[in-house]
Amino acid sequence: MKFALRLLSVITTFVMLIVLIGGALVTKTGSGLGCGRQWPLCHGRFFPEMNPASIIEWSHRMSTGVSTILVLALAVLCWKKISPVFRETKFLVIMSIIFLLLQALLGALAVVFGSNALVMALHFGISLISFASVLLLALLVFEATRSETKLVKPLHIGKKMQFHIYGLITYTYIVVYTGAYVRHTKSSLACSVFPFCSKDGALPAYFNQWVQMSHRAAALLLFVWIFVAMFHAMKHYKEQKQLYYGWIISAILITLQAISGVMSVYSQLALGYALAHSFFISCLFGVLCYFCLLIARFKYESKEPFK
């Protein structure tokens, strides 16, 4: 049973990541209406027509359907087997289900009735929360089925580190929204050079350029903030390996995220760079959510405040 639960948690997390990347693929390739304004059918049929847009949209719908079944199965088993061990299990189960259903509903409504960029930019963010919830459930599954040292130990986490973690997870979500808004307003190539919008460094001239440059400015602050948090962890948390290495991983991910973003511009939105951009931010958000789990464990299990 332990092996089966672990395997299910890994497969579910992987499929949720596919759903995230698949949604980005749908947006990048303009395949949102590849099946017309019908849901769940594709142009009145279960199987799509043999053209790229229909296949991409249909595959995304199928992966969402598979992920729903897997998440529900994992949720039931975690509720029964893991929640008696870890109190946070029920919260994560509820979050994973609610946000998975929300993202599926939002996607279906957008297909049938249409939507605007402000609303559709939420679609990726909602999926991101569901993915992170499933990822944390998978960590709890592995922790609960181990007989040795805990994977998620209660740590001493100071107020400054808590500020970095809570602030960064909130701000990262905002940056994710601005990035999704860039995609849905078709502003990805509004500025053809980097770091400025034009070679002469002039201010943005129209709406799409302002959208693109706003995202770049927000992403730059995120990049700097994560490195500040990493240096703080390296100085004060050398003995607490989850935080020490977690922040190093975060710095690597935000660097790869920045590189993939720049290369997306210079490659004229080459699909590989564009999808990598979504992949790295998903992983980064997952790491930050893991930090939040560490804080929750620390606050619950520590009797004295960390000085």
From Swiss-Prot:
Membrane topology annotation: Multi-pass membrane protein
GO terms, biological process: heme A biosynthetic process
One annotated GO molecular function: metal ion binding
Residues binding heme o, per UniProt: 60, 123
Protein location: Cell membrane
GO CC, any one term: plasma membrane
Ranges per topology, Cytoplasmic: 1-6, 87-92, 143-161, 238-242, 296-307
Main location: membrane
Active site: 57
Record-annotated disulphide pairs: 35-42, 191-197
E.C. number(s) listed in UniProt: 1.17.99.9
Signal peptide: none
Pathway this chain belongs to: Porphyrin-containing compound metabolism; heme A biosynthesis; heme A from heme O: step 1/1
Pfam family, one: COX15-CtaA
InterPro entries xref list: COX15/CtaA_fam (IPR003780), COX15/CtaA_HemeA_synthase (IPR050450), HemeA_Synthase_type1 (IPR023755)
Family: Belongs to the COX15/CtaA family. Type 1 subfamily.
Domain notes: The N-half (TM1-TM4) and C-half (TM5-TM8) domains are connected by an intracellular loop. Each domain is formed from four-helix bundles and they align in a pseudo twofold symmetry manner. The N-half domain is the substrate-heme O binding domain and the C-half domain is the cofactor heme B binding domain. The cysteines of disulfide bond Cys-35 and Cys-42 may be involved in transfer of reducing equivalents from quinol in the membrane to the active site of the enzyme.
Role description: Catalyzes the conversion of heme O to heme A by two successive hydroxylations of the methyl group at C8. The first hydroxylation forms heme I, the second hydroxylation results in an unstable dihydroxymethyl group, which spontaneously dehydrates, resulting in the formyl group of heme A.
Name assigned to this protein: Heme A synthase
The organism of origin for this protein: Bacillus pumilus (strain SAFR-032)
Gene name linked to the record: ctaA
